[in-house]
Amino acid sequence: MTASTPHHGTPRGGLSGRTVLVTGATSGIGRAAALAVARQGARVVLVGRDPERLRTVTNEVARTAGPAPDAFRADFAELRQVRDLGERLRDRYPRIDVMASNAGGMFWSRTTTQDGFEATIQVNHLAGFLLARLLRERLAGGRLILTSSDAYTQGRIDPDDLNGDRHRYSAGQAYGTSKQANIMTAAEAARRWPDVLAVSYHPGEVRTRIGRGTVASSYFRFNPFLRSAAKGADTLVWLASAPAEELTTGGYYSDRRLSPVSGPTADAGLAAKLWEAGAAAVGDTAH
């Protein structure tokens, strides 16, 4: 990891007038982050899968902070939709100051997308990785923030087996692997894209819709000991708005503090292999 430089994105004045893209913006952490950055004066760009919830959050942001944000629908379980989203965003915005790659999910049983990938690694990692690559030029001088989790310690990343075909499926391990991939990708992006401040973060255990339709859903939605979505989004919003000189590009953060990683997650050589494997998987090797 290398120290960040002050030209990366946000000055001390906050997010006023900055373009902030939030994926997974229709519920939970993404929704809370969108509302928070809008209150700081950002031009918010929402991305979500469900059109009704997307309209609801669009209206909530407009009521909170004035003008309605831009909203784009895309299902990250289909890479074709992600590519189309990338084209639309490139056409619309000459610059994106912050990309908060937050879309994610948990799948209780093994699910394969129409692209041929295990759904957890595609929705939580590969789709966001592809979108960041498609927006590479728009992110120059800006920030890339990847939502991760301390569940990364349960991950078993293998660049030669992104689908985890060599092991019996475990929802928890698949989720942890996807979050491990995000930490490693932020670190590798910092090495490959020096003009982008790339970081990942752990939001804490948050009351969200994750795991909907599974036995885990009630735990994540109703457990009184879990954090609120607003609290879970706090580090994301801080990473988007803090002075660049206070942050470390490539770093993994928890509760606004740089948090060390170890083992395979800290292996730069493995991260480079993951980057190349991901690029080949999504069919984009230009960056």
UniProtKB/Swiss-Prot annotation:
Which cysteines does the record link by disulfide bonds? none
Keywords, comma-separated and alphabetical? NAD, NADP, Oxidoreductase
Record-given protein name: Putative daunorubicin C-13 ketoreductase DnrU
Position of the signal peptide: none
Q: Where is the active site?
A: Y175
Q: Do the record's keywords include Lyase?
A: no
Q: What are the recorded GO MF terms, alphabetically?
A: oxidoreductase activity, acting on the CH-OH group of donors, NAD or NADP as acceptor
What is this enzyme's class at the first EC digit? oxidoreductase
Quick one: which gene encodes this? dnrU
Positions of NADP(+) binding: G24, A25, T26, S27, G28, I29, G30
A UniProt-annotated Pfam family: adh_short
Q: What job does this protein perform? A: Could reduce the 13-carbonyl of daunorubicin to yield (13S)-13-dihydrodaunorubicin. Could also be able to reduce the 13-carbonyl of doxorubicin.
From which organism does this entry originate? Streptomyces peucetius
Q: Where does substrate bind?
A: S149
EC number(s) from the headed UniProt entry: 1.1.1.-
Q: Which family is this sequence assigned to?
A: Belongs to the short-chain dehydrogenases/reductases (SDR) family.
